[in-house]
Amino acid sequence: MKTSLRLTSLALFMAAAMTASAQEGKPWIHDPSTIMQCDGKYYTFGTGGGGLISADGWNWYPGAERPGGGAAPDAMKIGGRYLVAYSSTGGGLGGGHAGRILTMWNRTLDPKSPDFGFTEPVEVASSEVDEDCDAIDAGLFMDPTTGRLWCTYGTYFGFIRIVELDPQTGARVEGNEAVNIAIDCEATTVIWRNGWYYLLGTHGTCCDGVNSTYNIVVGRSRNVTGPYLDNMGRDMIAGGGKMVVDAADRQFGAGHFGRYVEDEGVEKMSFHWEADLDRGGRSVLAIRPLLWENEWPVAGESFTSGVYEISSVRRGYALELAVDFVRHDIPRSRWWEASDEPIASYPNQTLEEVKDTWPEGEIPARIGDWMNRPHQRWTITAVPEAGGYLGGQYYKIQIEGTDRVLAAAKDAEVTVAPSFTGAAEQLWRIEQLTDGTFRIMPKEVPGTDRQYVLTSIADSTPTLAEYDFNSDNCKWKFIRK
């Protein structure tokens, strides 16, 4: 019996860990490209050719097609076409550093489309056998301030370099000279935000499974060609770099950063784990929230099931079941009198003490002072069969110890239903925003096809409304209990 209990506990632990850390399906990939969306599906390419496709952003399966083989591709949509860059040889393969960076175009990423077909690849950079740079690990960047297209490449065997490409052809700009911008990293890419260019690179040892020390670091510059300095003022050309994400509890070797901007204040970062212990030590696709702290990118945490206080950022009040307040029958301290009586420890109010005072059927939701009472404690549980969205799955939000669940209702209202049916209005998308707070979005709202989020329309009144990152009404915090 003890052995059985131990095995059951281990299975539950591993299931929770998998839920927290990995995409579902068969997300096996190494060196994933930046995630692209095409005709309602998500795509990423990896080393060796091919890649993954997802219909919802959570369940990933093989199926993406990319000719040319090679290593560490990247992808970008420019106008109505997709530009894919990849490297041929390089990386110290065969004992040398000879390599080539190539680019090619496609009108679609869907291999089943009649429009699918890559153009002939064009060489945009190369390296010689004994050169101090490897032409490998391409990263594409379109400067939103100038419309100029750039490509970084290189590994920790030498310099990271940046070259300019023609956004119309994908070819190297004539006469452009490569600029050295970093050392001691690989799998680089540039992103832009609020006047800063950020160079993200993968530092550490690669390709050794659970023993890989891969981690993702960053520096920033006011110019696309550098210098890129970290938070301590160290230049990445001298080995600097501020940590963005490193190993997790059961996942190791974070590498090959990609950024996906879904909405204002909603950003995701993609990368691979070199080894996921809960997935047989395989290299897997990972997607995390991308946060920004003091103008530096930081990896957020994937949301996990548990018991939570759901606190409105608007005022700090807690989401609750709208029932009558039941006084906790604990003697009041006579603080004005001295006493030598022993100090007692009293329990919190329990569900059994109050549940019979609650009405049957549907009950409205409300926001009120946090008192750690049963009508304020929410058990949040993943619903795997409901699918997901980019980087996350849907959850049910229920009053702890009961069947009562939070639900979207007609006229963009929010209520608490008596039981969970699996209906779309009872499924919730919980996404961490770039400032660390969360938005809570029902999968569907009865009577409309518009997307709404849980909103504090007043200090004590929750409703559903359009998302506005600049309003604290739309933001929530989850405090684990």
Residue ranges and their predicted role:
Residues 33, 74, 123, 189, ...:
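Residue-level detector of beta-strand face positions
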Residues 305-481:
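Lectin-like carbohydrate-binding module/patch detector with strong preference for beta-trefoil
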Residues 29-32, 70-72, 135-137, 185-188, ...:
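Conserved positions at the start
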Residues 247-261:
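Signature of short aromatic-glycine-proline-rich micro-motifs recurring in repeat-based ectodomains
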Residues 1-9:
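Bacterial N-terminal signal peptides that target proteins for export
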Residues 22-136, 142-185, 192-245, 264-306, ...:
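Beta-rich carbohydrate-recognition and catalytic domains
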Residues 11-21:
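Hydrophobic h-region of N-terminal signal peptides that target proteins for export
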Residues 13, 212-213, 407:
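His-enriched metal-coordination microenvironments in redox/metal-binding proteins
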